[in-house]
Amino acid sequence: MRSWVIPLLLAGVALAFDAADRRVPFSVLATGLLDEPAHLATAALGLLALACFIDAPRRFYVAGLIASVAIDLDHIPLYLGLLGNQDQRPVTHSLTTVLVIALAAAVSRRHRAVLAGCVAGLLIHFARDIAEGPPGVRMLWPIRDTAWTASYWWFLAMIITFTAVRLIFMTTGIPRRRARLFQPPVPVTSSETRSIPV
């Protein structure tokens, strides 16, 4: 498959499932079957764009994809009536969750790539949730309880930006070097070493 097909396919899936999700009346099953594929495709596209700039191990990207949909498991207590306000997304949909995982990544060298991937996946997930309009996302909880919302155009701009970045940078080969993250340094081969005159 040509390398430009995948970004375009992911963009199409994200836009199609998002459009259907906005039109279908809410129900746990129907909404989940439309909302989660849209989140997954959006995250995959965003991570492809990010991969133009960083060289990270596969587990970083796998963790990002999983986190981009797994965060919605926090809705289960809401649907079971175990949380008070059912008109709001759970407070785990906030930068507090991102900060906790980012701090864990900073102190855990062994799991740093996985945790950093989770951070990336969560940020992309929250960005799309914001673009779904009300009830929005309480990003600054517990400092502020105000929900952030944006229009569909925010989501469309995300998809266009991710797709354009991936296609343009992949085609031009720029940047020529990506930042190497969460991996041991590449050993210098003998051909790369410079002889020192005696």
Give the ranges of each region predicted by the language model:
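N-terminal membrane-targeting hydrophobic helices
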Residues: M1-V198
